[in-house]
Amino acid sequence: MTAPMRQHLSQQGVLARDPLPFAVCALGISQITAWGTSYYCLGVLAGPIAADTGWSRSLIFFGFTLALLAMGLVSTWTGRAIDNHGARGIMSFGTLLVSAGLVALSRVQSEAAYLAVWVFLGVGMRLCLYDAAFAALVQIVPSRGRTAISYLTLFGAFASTVFWIVGHFLNEALGWRQTLVLFAAR
């Protein structure tokens, strides 16, 4: 390719596209769905789960508490894994874990299984939520990591708003178990 052609293509944005907007938008959509389908799902589904299973709301939210504890317990390992292997693969694996966990959660019949699935979900959430996404942005645009992280958090702020509405609609139409299966397909 000749120098004038390269300069023309670069001016048109074909060769020298800034990766920041695409990375923020792609990870932003990923974070909206990740937070909405996992972290915020009980905001809508706790009541229907309690009504269907007869379990107390305390037990239902205790499951989420166990997820938070699991997230804390694997944080150091997660950080090391991201540093050693990059964020993309870790986030992808976390997304698979969360999807599997949501399907498992939709199938639980006992309190013990319910609580165990939340521990599993906690591990998956740690691998695919903000921590890994922030690291991914810094790996993509190291010199503008702070800016990218600020933009990404704006996307994440919409997760509860979007998924409480979506979750309520799906629960009314399909029930909580099928809603979780659809959330898993994210």
How would you describe each model-predicted region?
Residues 2-30:
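Cytosolic juxtamembrane N-terminal segment immediately preceding the first transmembrane helix
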Residues 22-57, 74-78, 163-167:
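Extracytoplasmic
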Residues 32, 101, 112-128, 153:
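Hydrophobic core of transmembrane alpha-helices in multi-pass small-molecule transporters
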Residues 49, 125-141:
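Intracellular juxtamembrane helix-capping segments at the cytosolic ends
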Residues 73-112:
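Conserved MFS/SLC helix-loop-helix module at the cytosolic interface between two early adjacent transmembrane helices
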Residues 143-164:
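Glycine-rich segments within core transmembrane alpha-helices of 12-TM secondary carriers
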Residues 178-186:
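Symmetry-related core transmembrane helices of the 12-TM Major Facilitator Superfamily/SLC fold
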